[in-house]
Amino acid sequence: MRIAVMGAGAWGTALALSLCASTASSHQVTLWTRSRQHLADLVSQRINRRYFSAFPLPASLRLTAGLEEAVEDAELALIVVPVSGLRETLREIAASGKKIPVIWGCKGFESQSAKLPHQVAEEEYAGAAPYGVLSGPSFALEIAQGLPAALTLASRDGEFAREVAAQLHAPRLRVYSCTDVVGVETGGAVKNVISIAAGICDGMGFGSNARAALITRGLAEITRLGLKLGGRMETFLGLTGVGDLILTCTGDLSRNRRVGLALAAGRSLPDILQELGHIAEGVHTAREVLRLSHLLGIEMPITKGVCSILDDGVPAGQAVEALLNREPKSEIY
């Protein structure tokens, strides 16, 4: 299959490396970057120095900074840009006149609009071609290393989801299919917020019991919001729900967890993000999720606590105390 990977960040580069290395399918892969300077570095070095300096880009991987060139003969576009760049990328693909199926790998809600990626696609790409989302517990570095992983490809077009999942499936990358786009996207977005909270919990030395409780109650928040938005319960118990949540709340490669650890140490958010050097989607997503929870009348105390730290300057310890001192209630409600 001819695949255009749109975005040469960590996740886009990892997917491109994985697709090129696949022995199960013979893919022709193009990696697109918006930056011509980045392209020049990739071409001259044949490595992505910023993210994966230890992994040479294979000779078969085509590189370009021209969007029309990237999608010209592609049979599938994998859009791997932050949520903030999804709308523009979809709009540019549509403007190219190439009506090719698209899959995105970003996780979060669009800032200001609080829209999930599929809602952005409905506005910018509806009717052009089938589309869907690729999500699940996956650190880009481990995908680049060829370590085993399992993901879910969701599309409202079930046949399309099954066909693309089969194409992306590889010996060490198992890809499942489903039709619950809302559930998959909600799990992938909100888990980043819970991951910040988990980092705060670990950074303050609260131990394994507290972390387990936080992850479990975080899953409850994800499920409440997801069901209200139209997702299915079983999705939140799968790879893109509890699976992704566990990984990002416990793995040392999680950017959002690292933000939480630094907040617990008393560091300022601007300094944390500057040192991180990469986007931590949970920071932006937290605000949109909290706004949605108010609009929909959903109780999300962990999300509220994270936002109080990020936006209101509440010390991490004080926010945790506020959570612990909430009125007792039934676990299931």
UniProtKB/Swiss-Prot annotation:
Tell me the residue numbers annotated for binding sn-glycerol 3-phosphate.
K107, G136, S138, K191, D244, S254, R255, N256
Lipid metabolism in keyword set: yes
**Which parts of the sequence bind NADPH?**
W11, R34, K107, A140, R255, I279, E281
Under the cellular component aspect of Gene Ontology, which terms does the record hold?
cytosol
InterPro entries annotated for this entry?
Answer: 6-PGluconate_DH-like_C_sf, 6PGD_dom2, G3P_DH_NAD-dep, G3P_DH_NAD-dep_C, G3P_DH_NAD-dep_N, NAD(P)-bd_dom_sf
Keyword Repeat annotated: no
Single Gene Ontology BP annotation: glycerophospholipid metabolic process
**Keywords, in A-Z order:** Cytoplasm, Lipid biosynthesis, Lipid metabolism, NAD, NADP, Nucleotide-binding, Oxidoreductase, Phospholipid biosynthesis, Phospholipid metabolism
Do you know which Pfam families this protein is assigned to?
NAD_Gly3P_dh_C, NAD_Gly3P_dh_N
Task: List the GO molecular function terms.
Answer: glycerol-3-phosphate dehydrogenase [NAD(P)+] activity; NAD binding
Catalytic residues, per the record, are K191 (proton acceptor)
Q: Where in the cell is it found?
A: Cytoplasm
The protein's annotated pathway: Membrane lipid metabolism; glycerophospholipid metabolism
Catalytic activity line of the entry:
sn-glycerol 3-phosphate + NAD(+) = dihydroxyacetone phosphate + NADH + H(+); sn-glycerol 3-phosphate + NADP(+) = dihydroxyacetone phosphate + NADPH + H(+)
Q: Which positions make up the signal peptide?
A: none
Q: What is its EC number?
A: 1.1.1.94
Coarsely, its chief localization is cytoplasm
User: Can you tell me which family this protein belongs to?
Assistant: Belongs to the NAD-dependent glycerol-3-phosphate dehydrogenase family.
Briefly, what is this protein's role?
Catalyzes the reduction of the glycolytic intermediate dihydroxyacetone phosphate (DHAP) to sn-glycerol 3-phosphate (G3P), the key precursor for phospholipid synthesis.
The record's section on PANTHER family has: GLYCEROL-3-PHOSPHATE DEHYDROGENASE, GLYCEROL-3-PHOSPHATE DEHYDROGENASE [NAD(+)] 2, CHLOROPLASTIC
From the Swiss-Prot or TrEMBL record, give the protein name: Glycerol-3-phosphate dehydrogenase [NAD(P)+]
Organism per entry: Nitrosospira multiformis (strain ATCC 25196 / NCIMB 11849 / C 71)
